[in-house]
């Protein structure tokens, strides 16, 4: 019950954040309209340098065009970007106020919200699902085909397990009785098991799928878990990453937050439309090898989802996580 209350509180917080950002993006009153505002016009918000972190991987890929453009004002750069190797490098800095925004896993956003009692809030979804069932063979054409099979995977007790178990259950498959889930410590162990022939089916995220395909002849993406989730048609979505911000920063600099979201959306559009050039930047920033990025990008589901669509998709996904690990 406690987790459920926190979940609904998170939904309300999302609504508050979106209203703040929307207000920041409203156009100014037309001075020629003949209308006199009831209150004095506020001065334009002074430019501020937003400190933004992202984890190396798909959740950082949509940022590369914005990072490369390095927009600035008379006061200096608008953004100070940091790329981190793990969430452990980002979480303390965000809580201490050393960062203003961050691209993090969706489940971590919920943890941060609860841990800080609302001091960290969600602004946007930036990555949908990146999980795939891969197979060295042709036996798996649907989730039902996993019955009686062994699937090697990493991420027990986290999103990969919760997402797979949820999808199996929703498709009438008992994940404990109908499928053998062989959990490994790292995704690289799953790739090794496939390469050695010890396993023929695995659950892997991008870009590990692309890396595995480069090493194993005939390995194919049998099932896209994002598509399987969408088939449920329940209004939610399989979500990998979100953009979070400190509540204090959002309240103090709503225009800066609104401008960042607009710039980020444009960066995402460019990345998705210019795969080769985007992959080169991704490699240049050390996020993922450029050759791997070019092949993986079309399957990484890089997005910028805000507004009503965010309020529809994210709570439904988080509810699945809470039900799996209340």
Where are each of the predicted segments found?
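Short, glycine-/small- and polar/acidic-enriched structural segments
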Residues: 30-32, 36-176, 180-183, 200-206, ...
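Bacterial N-terminal signal peptides that target proteins for export
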Residues: 1-11
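Pocket-lining segment of extracytoplasmic ligand-binding domains
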Residues: 107-108, 116, 182, 188-281
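C-terminal motif of bacterial Sec signal peptides marking the signal peptidase cleavage site
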Residues: 18-22
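Short, solvent-exposed loop/beta-turn-alpha elements that line the ligand-binding surface or hinge
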Residues: 70-77, 227-236, 303-311
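Secondary-structure end/capping motifs
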Residues: 250-325
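Solvent-exposed, polar/charged alpha-helical surfaces in well-ordered, non-transmembrane soluble domains
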Residues: 61-69, 88, 92, 96, ...
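Bacterial signal peptide processing site
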Residues: 24-26
């Amino acid at each position: 019950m406690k987790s459920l209350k926190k979940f609904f509180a998170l939904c309300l917080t999302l609504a508050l954040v979106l209203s703040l950002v929307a207000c920041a993006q409203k156009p100014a009153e037309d001075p020629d309209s003949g209308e006199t505002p009831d209150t004095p016009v506020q001065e334009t918000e002074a430019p501020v340098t937003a400190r933004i972190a992202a984890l190396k991987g798909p959740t950082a890929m949509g940022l590369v065009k914005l990072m490369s453009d390095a927009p600035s004002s008379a006061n200096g750069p608008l953004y100070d970007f940091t790329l981190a190797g793990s969430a452990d490098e980002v979480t303390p800095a965000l809580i201490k106020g050393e960062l203003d925004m961050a691209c993090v896993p969706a489940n971590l956003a919920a943890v941060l919200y609860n841990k800080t009692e609302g001091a960290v809030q969600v602004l946007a979804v930036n990555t949908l699902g990146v999980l795939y069932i891969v197979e060295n063979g042709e036996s798996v054409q649907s989730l039902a085909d996993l019955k009686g099979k062994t699937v090697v995977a990493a991420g027990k007790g986290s999103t990969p397990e919760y997402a797979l178990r949820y999808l199996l259950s929703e498709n009438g498959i008992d994940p404990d009785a109908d499928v053998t889930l062989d959990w490994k410590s790292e995704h690289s162990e799953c790739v090794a098991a496939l390469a050695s022939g010890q396993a023929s089916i695995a659950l892997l995220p991008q870009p590990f799928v692309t890396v595995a395909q480069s090493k194993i002849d005939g390995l194919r993406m049998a099932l896209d878990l994002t598509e399987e989730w969408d088939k449920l048609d329940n209004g939610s979505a399989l979500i990998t990453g979100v953009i979070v911000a400190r509540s204090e920063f959002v309240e103090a600099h709503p225009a800066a937050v609104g401008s960042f979201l607009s710039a980020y959306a444009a960066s995402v559009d460019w990345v998705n439309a210019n795969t080769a050039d985007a992959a080169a930047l991704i490699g240049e920033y050390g996020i993922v090898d450029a050759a791997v990025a070019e092949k993986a990008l079309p399957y990484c589901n890089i997005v910028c989802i805000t507004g009503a669509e965010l309020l529809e998709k994210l709570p439904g996904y988080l509810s699945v996580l809470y039900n799996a690990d209340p």
